[in-house]
Amino acid sequence: ASGLMARKQMEQLIKNCDEFNISLYDINNPNQGIVHVIAPEKGMTLPGMIIVCGDSHTSTHGAFGALSFGIGTSEVEHVLATQTLKQQRFKNMKIEIIGDVPQFVTAKDIILFVIGRLGSSGGTGYVIEFCGNVIKKMSMEERMTVCNMAIEMGAKSGIIAPDEITYSYLREKIYSPYGLFWKKSIDYWKTLKSDKDAFFDKCFTIDVSNLAPQVTRGTNPDQVTSINEKIPNYNKFHSIVQKNSAKSACKYMGLKEGTYLTDIFIDKVFIGSCTNARIEDLRSASTILKNRKIANNVKAIVVPGSGSVKQQAEMEGLDKIFINAGFEWRLPGCSMCLGMNNDRLNVGERCASHSNRNFEGRQGRGGRT
């Protein structure tokens, strides 16, 4: 029944796009994939835009200095009908990331650490501006990872001021401005930054100089621990709510306090999602996997974020590195991030996942992310 409903929904979507002359990257389009990967790589996402989409991780586009956030179905209808959306004023928060980033620490590690510090509701009601020397040095794909995960601390969106790295990324993209319009656009984009004396409702400065790679151990993105540490003792938490949440998470995950994260066995590996399925992510993973093999009892898949990413990876020979290491090389899409199609965990299976959420059942009923 659900398959039939999905087919009808897709057929209606195709019909509506055709009727109203809306570009559709359907499954037959060689560049199809995840919207939060396609829009930036094609230059559809530009600084200063207001972008809404029926998906919470629309905040990804904030990496370009665009105000972007997820909306519900009825709001999507309203936007399509009126090109407007009534919103209450958001509170604003500044998170300054400073320090020298250690080797092997990624943008994903940094944002997970921030979420662990502030909590899964620490950003509720806020649009968060990320800044600081660490953010300035990040590539656009790294910045997208940071803004993508802002939602996991309850924020409405994340945003980063555009700069030369932004302009360089957007130059000569299919939908980017060109010629005289390009120069005028950059002149405008340079104004899209907070004033030096701008007021923020909350400000935080976080030094990542001593940060180690981060791994979530529970059923919420703020239940995060450094890879070289143990699962914390319940008594470490001062709040009864946090203590009970940690106990509940360990029970669901089949883990015990005091266990080193490096001693935990896994059943599956998923490289993909709108958080970490871009070409830089695949390059990083392939560098580690080159001339190595995964264990025989582990099933691993790579799902590029778009057809363009897949094509680029294949041109660079990355697909062969993954395949030789024992991974399946898949077509673009969302896949195991949310247990789509048959890409899901079985009850009790544990997955090391590149995705953004580790909720109970997110990757399959009883699955442990």
Swiss-Prot record:
Keyword Metal-binding listed: yes
Any one GO molecular-function label of the UniProt entry: 4 iron, 4 sulfur cluster binding
Pathway: Amino-acid biosynthesis; L-leucine biosynthesis; L-leucine from 3-methyl-2-oxobutanoate: step 2/4
CDD domains in the cross-refs: IPMI
Swiss-Prot/TrEMBL catalytic activity: (2R,3S)-3-isopropylmalate = (2S)-2-isopropylmalate
Cofactor binding note: Binds 1 [4Fe-4S] cluster per subunit.
Family matches, as Pfam families: Aconitase
SUPFAM superfamilies: Aconitase iron-sulfur domain
Family affiliation: Belongs to the aconitase/IPM isomerase family. LeuC type 1 subfamily.
Record function comment: Catalyzes the isomerization between 2-isopropylmalate and 3-isopropylmalate, via the formation of 2-isopropylmaleate.
PANTHER family assigned: 3-ISOPROPYLMALATE DEHYDRATASE, HOMOACONITASE, MITOCHONDRIAL-RELATED
Protein name as it appears in the record: 3-isopropylmalate dehydratase large subunit
Source organism of the structure: Buchnera aphidicola subsp. Uroleucon rurale
